[in-house]
Amino acid sequence: MAKAKFERIKPHVNVGTIGHVDHGKTTLTAAISAVLSKTYGGEVKNFAQIDNAPEERERGITINTSHIEYDTPIRHYAHVDCPGHADYVKNMITGAAQMDGAILVVAATDGPMPQTREHILLSRQVGVPFIIVFMNKCDMVDDEELLELVEMEVRELLSEYDFPGDDLPVIQGSALKALEGQPEWEAKILELAEALDTYIPEPARDIDKPFLLPIEDVFSISGRGTVVTGRVERGIVRVSDEVEIVGVRPTTKTTCTGVEMFRKLLDEGRAGENCGVLLRGTKRDDVERGQVLAKPGSINPHTTFESEVYVLSKEEGGRHTPFFKGYRPQFFFRTTDVTGTIELPEGVEMVMPGDNIKMVVTLIYPIAMDDGLRFAIREGGRTVGAGVVAKIIA
């Protein structure tokens, strides 16, 4: 009898390169692809293929991003690389490419530069949890002390933004020399891959997180009660589970008495599935679109938060003119628009289309949120910006 083919599904981790322009992010991406495919198998992407990043649209925002994949013995990685600084800003704020960890590329010949700092700050704001440093172009620096100095500088900069600068891995290498096949530098790429494997923990799968379903629609079924529908964002809901209805109004508790999908009754609804959840003793008017159904105690409603925002340029269909403090647009969270006011950082009078900016937002009513929640800014149904909740205030 033929044996069934054994396929081990490796854990999947999302990473990306960040850092200052011309410090070697794309060359490093190509070097990782080349060295790992040579060592562990897989498809090679060369520099030109990665550099020619296709245009993508995420929430109406044009972003150029290159996606490559590679394997280590224990994991499968999806890696994003962006050609331009603006692409990084947009990518990180919209969450188009969410990263479980980032590889910060710093040229040893230059040390940290303005965009190095900006990418670290962005990583902190949008919740990139882990950073590994690759000091590039080390073949061009003969002085050991200089390399040590640059490493110290990078570690201090990371600590300044609350990353564990003293403890995180720093690998000194040369992406170009590794790409040219020089064994001593190829070894540095393998060292980087090992750091990815050991330093970035395996991310929790959506299905293992606490249950959350953004409510899209509410129906009442005579004799059975109220059904809310939507796509389960994370976790699992089972019949007879206690759930909370969070956001917009005071939080209430109820019980799931049924789950249905495509008119069939199920025992549970899981992350990624569109389903209807029947709620015990809940009236049709007690629930509305914009609220979420969640595991009790797992998420709270908030109105005020600090955010990192990218304002669409005129070419992207955004505003043609700047906006000022006191601007009152709609903030679109998950399934609904909420009006809010903004507070700009000290010394900032106006925000131009194409800018990215830190702002404090106060909504007119509370929405269920955690740090890292993405939102769109809209005016009359047109998207004019994208943002992420960096820190909840109230």
UniProtKB/Swiss-Prot annotation:
One matching Pfam family: GTP_EFTU_D2
InterPro entries per UniProt: EF-Tu_GTP-bd, EF-Tu_GTPase, EFTu-like_2, EFTU_2, G_TR_CS, P-loop_NTPase, Small_GTP-bd, T_Tr_GTP-bd_dom
SUPFAM superfamilies per UniProt: EF-Tu/eEF-1alpha/eIF2-gamma C-terminal domain, P-loop containing nucleoside triphosphate hydrolases, Translation proteins
Family indicated by similarity: Belongs to the TRAFAC class translation factor GTPase superfamily. Classic translation factor GTPase family. EF-Tu/EF-1A subfamily.
Lineage, highest ranks first: Bacteria, Pseudomonadati, Pseudomonadota, Gammaproteobacteria, Alteromonadales
Region listing for G1, in residue ranges: 19-26
Single GO term (MF): translation elongation factor activity
Name the record gives this protein: Elongation factor Tu 2
Region feature (G3): 81-84
Domain tr-type G: 10-204
Taxonomic source organism: Shewanella frigidimarina (strain NCIMB 400)
